[in-house]
Amino acid sequence: MAGEQGVDFSGYERIKATRRGRVLTLSLSNPGKLNAVDAAMHRELSRVFLDAADDPASDIVVLTGEGASFSAGGDLNWMKQGFESGTKGPDAAEAKRIVFSLLDLEKPIVAKVAGPAIGLGATLALFCDVIFAAESARFADPHVRAGIVAGDGGAIIWPQLIGYARAKEYLITGDAISGAEAARIGLVNHAVPEDELDASVDAFADRLAGGAQMAIRYSKVSANIGLKQLAHSILDASVGYEMVTFTTDDHREAVRSFLEKRTPKFGRGI
């Protein structure tokens, strides 16, 4: 209702919250790094959708990135710090909580994607209910190019959206596609010229905000039942495989070669 006190998101460092009526916009924010996911953002992503669910001042959530990027995926410097310090990569419990809290959010969540949505960035966008992308946006899940498994949800959501054959090709090559091509093959709902993206998302969010909220929410919840069951059947294994590959020589070589701007020399990795 109008005037309700919303959840205070000011304590978040890597996610910025803004409000427009009953629409809550969450913007990934890692300035200078194309909103890459570092330890702080990963931790915050594991709880921000729970806070959004509890927010009484919003009915619709928009997920986007600050500036000209949605998210470039995992921060390679964070990965390098991980293997140099002997840790096994991102926290597995956090990784699972990100996916499940997205799926458990009853409010419709709309992705607004400009620029790159890569790796976990793509996963976040694709688990949203409706995805708007700039025609020039880029989607990819190049975990394999970092020597790791696409375990954070990509192996779940890509096949559901575009079928197993296409999804496996993109997951085992890491190849990128444009927003226009993503819409053509059904990976996203809508691709629009970049200068029309904000207005398109605002209009759609306002349309949902003016609808029957209980009916909208429970229709979404019902549609998500099968997807949640699938996620529960896959995510433990896929995250586990990813954690294993964070310890490999191939992963270390992938990260170092990228930071050193050279071609990686992979071993067999098994």
Give the location of each predicted region.
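Conserved CoA-thioester-binding segment of acyl-CoA-metabolizing enzymes
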Residues: 1-66, 100
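C-terminal alpha-helix plus adjacent terminal tail
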Residues: 1-24, 55, 70, 174-180, ...
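Glycine- (often His-adjacent) and acidic-residue-rich active-site loop
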Residues: 9, 47, 65-104, 117, ...
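Residue-level signature of the cytosolic catalytic core of signaling kinases
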Residues: 37, 91-94, 151, 193, ...
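Hydrophobic alpha-helical membrane-association signature
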Residues: 41-44, 94, 197, 238
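Crotonase-fold acyl-CoA enzyme core
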Residues: 100-216, 243, 247-248, 252-256, ...
